[in-house]
Amino acid sequence: MAHANAESHAGSHHYTSTGLDNRKLAIWIFIGSECMLFASLISTYLIYKGKSVVGPFPHEAWTNPQTGQAFPAILDIPVTSISTFVLLMSSLAMVMALAAIESRGKPSGAKSKLGNYLLTSSRFWLFMTCLMGATFLGFQAYEFTSFVHEGLSIRTNLFGSSFFTLTGFHGAHVTAGVIWLGTLLAIDMKRGLQPKDAVWVDIAALYWHFDDVVWIAIFTLVYLIQ
């Protein structure tokens, strides 16, 4: 009887023959497919890079042929660097949120109330992750609006088409991540996420870290390399 209960308990974790939880395997397969998607989008951007006939251009100043008005290079690297830093810090907050849930019910070892709170408050860290993700999206919305105001849209030239498609897809993924983490935050506030729920937070964390890694590639290839 005890043996049967043990088998039932082990089976409830849904492990594959490799010892990996089915839910984690599913997210890794999904991330693999997303890698191929972004690889194709980045490749398309690189193929068309520098082939736009008319401006605006990413790294070169240009003059509007109709008005004669001169414009600087359209990419604002300092502003985007700030948004990139915010997104990277959100990954740290996500790590802290997962650690807080996994250690729930265990002594934190912190000597102060503040230290104990920061080590055990998954709600705080989930909120900070969502906030920083939303801040990144706010920066992206500002950037898109500025580009359109300066004459760059998805139909303007090859750069505009490939840029808006690539960064727009990434922004959509970040939006989905913020909604996902916001849902986990709501659940945590309602009933409290326990160590047994950590796998779901871990899956969300894998997705969030993937979004960050993709953005590092985009930021490097689009903004930094001229």
List PLM regions with ranges:
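...captures the hydrophobic TM-helix bundle architecture rather than a specific catalytic motif
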Residues: 1-226
